[in-house]
Structures are given as structure tokens and as C-alpha cells.
Amino acid sequence: MFKKIAADALGLSDIGKIIEPQDYDKTDADDYVMHEDNEKIYFLIKTKADEYCFTNLALIHVDGERATSSKRTLKRYPYSQYKISDVFLETAGKVDLDVEIKFKLGGEQFDIDVHKDQIEKLKDLYKALLRIAETTYENDILINQAEQSLDKAVTILHHTRPEHVNIETQYKELTEFGFTWLTSVRSQYHIKDFGDVFEKYINN
């Protein structure tokens, strides 16, 4: 009930409104942020039906079936599992009341309308999402190259193995090295926390 009253106080409609940090506690999404894991809200768009909460770890979507219903479905999209791509910002024409940011998270398409007088803030989100998408794309290439390099190294060692080397011992050593190598690469390039990107573009 309190959240509904707060939504009315924020003057919400079907067109999204960017919520200021001091009002995050008036939203439903704030209840589902994993503060215990140092998760932090960086950007929040709210309509009467939906909330789109961008944290350093994930997009939290509080999905309302319709503005007149109190029923909500909580959807969480970790950036490490749902890659951001196809980020677009559509500006307003002379008679338009809203601007629109579009992007994909994994296989999900998001089209979010925001009041056009908040376009400057929306530009910051656009830049942050675009940078995350670029970083993820580049890192996927590096991870793939690392895996291919390991495969080539294993093949070369297999064909140049001296006769006196124990096959079982060599296989064990290669397996342990490969696991350590790939774990190290994944730790470096499979990013889960994009707080530094949001800090750069949202809070700067």
C-alpha cells in the first residue's frame, strides 16, 4: 500500500520517469537489491506498471501486468549471464512526449519510454549500457582466443611427446594446467560487476 501511495506521489504514468537516489526506497525493486553482496542501484526507471532497476550486477525488472493491478512479477537479469547488445537511444520529435532506450539482454528485448525532459540523464544510461556491451563483446573474443590457444598447445604437446614420458602423468599435468589457465582467463575477462562503468558514466 505504501509503495502504491509513493508511486502516486512520484507522478507516474505509462511513460517512465527516472527516479532520484533519495527516492529509491519508494520503489518495489529496492526490496530485491542484494545489498549483502554489495549490490548497488545506479539507475532506476519507473512507470505505473513497471520498474527497471539497473545495479552494478544486474537489471531487476519488476514487471506489472497492467497499471491498475497490484500483481507484479520479479525478473532478474545478471549481466554475466544475459549479455547486453543492440543498444539504441531514440530521441523525441517536436510533438513527442517521450524518448526511448532500446537494448537486448540475452534474448529479451527491452523498449523503455522516458519523459523527454529527462533525456540528458537517459544519455548517461545509454553510454553505460553501450560500454558494457562493448566490453563484454571484446572479452568474449579474448576468452575464445585463450581456449583456442590452449587447444593448440595440447595438440602440439601430444604430437611431440618423448617416448619415455608417462602418458597418464602428462595427461594429469595438462588437465591441471588447462583448468588453472581457463579459470584464470575466465576470472579476468568474465566480468560480473560493472560498478566501475556505472560510476564513470552515471555518477560522474
Curated annotation (Swiss-Prot):
Keywords: Coiled coil. Residues 109-136 form a coiled coil. InterPro entries: PHb, PHb_sf, YvbH_oligomer_dom. The keyword Coiled coil applies. Gene3D superfamilies: 1.10.287.210, Bacterial Pleckstrin homology domain. Signal peptide: none annotated. SUPFAM superfamilies: PH domain-like. The keyword Coiled coil applies. This is Uncharacterized protein YvbH. It comes from Bacillus subtilis (strain 168).
